[in-house]
């Protein structure tokens, strides 16, 4: 598939490092190639497949079968088999076998797969506008066709051998059964384990191609892998599912079950069956015509039976000289049987009989409550019914059996198969209906004298004596009595067996009722145990939910308690902060009041000096109040704290006029330690003269 990529232009480009060229390496063989063989160095250089490019850009082989297509490739001449071959698109006959072989598989089939499938690169490429390498490769291959004649001859011989093998495989697949076809395909493809096709019989959709027919299409024969999972490995003969067979039986069973479900339910009221007219060309009108010559034709048979009615289908077996044919109505069949049976034709006595009717079934083991309508409705699921009736005695009593006549033999066969494989119940009783073929003798003519062979010795011996009564105590009477006793014994045993069967049926009915009661009781017990277990489970779930709710409630209470505690502590802290702020506000108000008092004292300080020259003493007296306040160690003002100026009223005679010009607040100028005990108040202040800005609250 890489011929569009790997061209013979080694002189223009440097090839990739390859394995050393092997001696006597044959070129790649393209089986069934219709065009000239193109030489390809990429496939014959001895290099491994993984070293080369896996897929080319556009190389779909539409004509020749590649390495993997094999003997059956391409559907045997034109039908496209979608088997998903990405490396070798093409078949032997140009049908496009798309086997799912991506290259690298070693197809070791009988004839065609002698090369080890190193991803065939000699396929003829399609003409593509954007694929320039294909055109150059075609021009180059035209010059190299002379050097490839030996490979061409060998490929053609192998193609012929492959075509012969394919034709032989197809003929065998059509002539033999499924097992033989599969064995043949396996014998031709015993070493084929790759994912593609190949082999004489099919080769991944070869031979018949496309999932059926011929040499095992749809992945049959060669073991190809079809993309359709339902058609994988359809062997040899038929190519669908398992070679010749299909899943129609399984599908019919499914439809029967669907129809049965549609009528399952109470059957208390069933509509009456309309009496239909006689079906034309039914199974009851089928005649057997024997002892014919092998030169008879269908036209002669139609002319023979034409006076008695219309003739339907005719089946002739000239090797055994008999024929089956259908007359339109039963009365016409009877009319044709009487005169034609025993008639002479070309020196032979023609035998005309009613053919065995395989569409009539006998249904037994029925309960007394099964009517014609229920029997008809129950067996109608298998196919159209011509007649269904319950057998009764001369008094109209139910005999426990009936007959069902189908319109088709296939419906009767399906009914017989399913009723024998499974238990088919018509009512609530567990008595399954028993179905068996019923041979109906519609021949009312019996055995006429002309039908006997009078040339036999036994005939002459038996007919030598006529009818008679035996004398008492004679030889004939003795052995005649023994025959009667033998038949009486048979009848008595038959009656005893019937009575025993009746007793066993009644016993089985009683056991069935008891078993049904026990089974229903066991079902009730199981239901009770189930409900008890459900009750226990629900109780455990309820307790678990209650426990979870209790735990959640406790967690919520703990959370609320913790939240309340936090709120209380927060409120206590807020109250303490508020109380502290109130105290600070009170102290601040007191400080403001004191400041206002100090401001007032500063504004009216001259009046406190005692007036005039004698103000020294008066000032001292006036200052004594503040001295006591300042000496208080509990004062919040630093300016008054520790002021021990207590003897200002003593020797306070300054220089005269200078001392009187100062106000009486000289004691507040004002260190913490004013140790002026008796000296000049305005003169030497022993403390720190701190300004008013030193006040601290």
Swiss-Prot record:
InterPro entries named in the record: NOPS (IPR012975), Nucleotide-bd_a/b_plait_sf (IPR012677), RBD_domain_sf (IPR035979), RRM_dom (IPR000504)
Alphabetical GO biological process terms: visual perception
UniProt feature coiled coil, ranges: 488-586
Pfam families referenced in this protein's UniProt entry, alphabetically: NOPS, RRM_1
Compositionally biased tracts (Low complexity): 102-118, 139-191, 623-635, 642-659
PROSITE patterns: RRM
Residue ranges with Basic and acidic residues bias: 224-233, 551-565
SUPFAM superfamilies reported for this sequence: RNA-binding domain, RBD (SSF54928)
CDD domains linked to this entry: NOPS_NONA_like, RRM1_p54nrb_like, RRM2_p54nrb_like
GO MF annotation terms: RNA binding
Alphabetical keyword list: Coiled coil, Repeat, RNA-binding, Sensory transduction, Vision
Annotated stretches, region: Disordered: 1-253, 551-575, 601-697
Biased segments, Polar residues type: 1-29
Bias-annotated ranges (Gly residues): 61-80, 195-223, 234-246, 603-622
Domain RRM: 285-357, 359-445
Function field: Required for normal vision and courtship behavior in Drosophila.
Protein's recorded name: Protein no-on-transient A
Gene (name only): nonA
